[in-house]
């Protein structure tokens, strides 16, 4: 294969993985969709928006997971969505973004430097989640790593470096996001508690309760009638294995709370609409390790969460679902499988065996896919910059506009 030889000569680290991995791939949880494209929803404006972000998810990752799960002619749930686009991901100071700058772009509508969250080097900017809350919409963040990690932080915090996770935890509570599910309990515990990552004695879990949050460590404790819920299911990143809740289960629970029409006394509530961000956080982790089987599993877990969003949107008729990524990780490619023995010309070999190659263990500058379904989906076709996403969402939801600097703030 000439491209492999050329890549090796250029000094690229090429790692080839076969679909016949040494570890069995457990995807028994995956429920594949039908093959028909979802029908368009005629409403022009959504009442609700669910944004799914697959961390590190490029087209190579999506295609590889599809082939392993449902075959080359099948479709994932996200691939059933009728509107597609391509998203450019560069940051202000690099052709290759990180999750902090990418989240800031998708939340605040600005390009910023890598590692910076919710601001540029000079000043902070409001996120679409903050603007939605000001407009009266309900808001939520659901992730499988720490809730203080770069992607969720980009939607509700403003710090000079993504590693300031103890500060981010304080800002998340101050932002009063209605529903927050994920890991990261260590950043909310006072320093004298085993496992705490804090250097002070602030008990943010107690502060959350005093602020009106119901704190849970198990989804069985979540009721739709709750107004504000903080669920931390691991000290740092979740394992994404039972007994922890799956991303799909957390997504369903978050939607249930955000869309609830009754309080816990059975009294009716107005349904102002909601904006929810759901991240498949650990696709990226697997790609950094070039671990193909883990990547496939994480992407399919993410796709099951997308399924939950699609099923709600199909019944609701007023919900826009977007699926995209912050960046691609690993430079994953699908390449020709080795030629059969005795074959003179490998180009003539017809094989459906999956063979993949990683080009690195870091982020890349590849554009990433975007899939859209629901009212307003047609605004997300074509080639978009990642800063275009919040700008168009602001128009659809009647909030914003972005970018919008924070005039007075106590953030650091």
Where are these regions (language model features)?
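Extracytoplasmic mature domains of secreted/periplasmic and thylakoid-lumen proteins
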Residues: 114-170, 176
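Active-site-adjacent structural elements in enzyme catalytic domains
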Residues: 45-66, 121-135
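A post-motif C-terminal structural segment
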Residues: 22-26, 43-48, 57-63, 67-104, ...
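Structural motif
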Residues: 52, 142, 322-324
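A short, compositionally biased domain-edge/stem linker segment
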Residues: 27-41
